[in-house]
Amino acid sequence: QEKLPYSEIPIAANEFTPGTTASRLIDGLGFRYYWTTEGLKEIDLVYKPNAAARSSEETIDHILGLSQVILNATLKVKNGQKQPEMTFVEKRKKTLENLHQASKTLRFSNDISQYKMIFGAKELPFWNVINGPIADAIWHVGQVVSFRRSSGNPINPKINHLSGTIKE
């Protein structure tokens, strides 16, 4: 099986810069997403707390879209492309790869103000990437954690979110 990014959080940068800080924020999201979605079963994916709510898989679809917006900002490309149909495994892989690529770009950037969210002719500064899709994705990862606990499949208790590692 192919090794996906974020089974552990990458080693932190040696210095604090806007780029390394934004990168680390995305790395934290990637690590949480990796372990939140690891070992999900069909019963977890279809779970929703009530008829009006999104299912776990619909929430994962939304997180995939958010990861694409984050990546597109770092690629300096417009948003609005439709995702192809994918299996859960493919969505998970694509989301993790999107986050990893965006993080790497930001980590080595001296000027993150060059990265903007582009919707048609409208450009929004990187601040909006932070309080928009990054914050929203973190929020929704928490929802999937709650949903999988409710469907009887809690996340691995050996995850150490502070250190970004798995306890032995």
Ranges and model annotations:
Residues 1-5:
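Bacterial Sec-dependent N-terminal signal peptides
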Residues 7-23:
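Short, low-complexity N-terminal intrinsically disordered segments enriched in polar/charged residues
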Residues 10-11, 24, 34, 45-81, ...:
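Short, contiguous alpha-helical
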Residues 22-25, 29-36, 66, 91-105:
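Alpha-helical packing segments of well-folded alpha/beta enzyme cores
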Residues 39-45, 106-114, 149-155:
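Surface-exposed helix-capping loop/turn segments at secondary-structure junctions
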Residues 62, 75-98:
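Mid-length scaffold segments of soluble, non-membrane domains
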Residues 87-141:
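Acidic/histidine-rich alpha-helical segments that form the ligand environment
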